[in-house]
Amino acid sequence: MFKKLIGLLFLMPMTALATQFIEGKDYQTVASAQLSTNKDKTPLITEFFSYGCPWCYKIDAPLNDWATRMGKGAHLERVPVVFKPNWDLYAKAYYTAKTLAMSDKMNPILFKAIQEDKNPLATKQSMVDFFVAHGVDREIAKSAFENSPTIDMRVNSGMSLMAHYQINAVPAFVVNNKYKTDLQMAGSEERLFEILNYLVRKSA
């Protein structure tokens, strides 16, 4: 009897974890077929965000910490959304930094400038000047924001993904092309990461 009781005590946390999150309330199953696959079988977490979103800024550092803790257990990708006219420039800024292998440097700087310093960077010229101030050649920066089919294609691809997954609020996350959640569904930053952990395990 005692052994059975001990066994039940060990099972209880797992059972509680399994029933803690409710489909349709805390997360949604992606109804349509996936558009991409992760070839190395590592769970793929796609964050939909914008530098223009204050909540995206608030969770950016915790999200980076979470991704670091996950290590090889998950792969984080970011997709900038375009909900407002100037967010198109923010999407171009993200892909420009990524193309130049400057994402780790530029992401926090762009977030801080727009969210804390209240510098909207709402024109092509202001974005070009901003990138130049942080070490990018002016002609390269100008080309990225004014005439880059590659950058434009990546922005459009991101918008297609946004529509595909029916993203209407950010920050939002798609886990392994199977499940979707966002900060609004989670209700808090702490709970959001708990849900992401749960969905990573569930999708494996």
UniProtKB/Swiss-Prot annotation:
Pfam families: DSBA. Keywords: Disulfide bond, Periplasm, Redox-active center, Signal. Residues 1-18 form the signal peptide. GO terms for cellular component: periplasmic space. Residues 19-146 form the Thioredoxin domain. InterPro entries: DSBA-like_thioredoxin_dom, DsbA/DsbL, Thiol_disulfide_DsbA, Thioredoxin-like_sf, Thioredoxin_CS, Thioredoxin_domain. GO terms for molecular function: disulfide oxidoreductase activity. It is found in: Periplasm. The keyword Glycosyltransferase does not apply. Involved in disulfide-bond formation. Acts by transferring its disulfide bond to other proteins. Belongs to the thioredoxin family. DsbA subfamily. This is Thiol:disulfide interchange protein DsbA. The gene is dsbA.
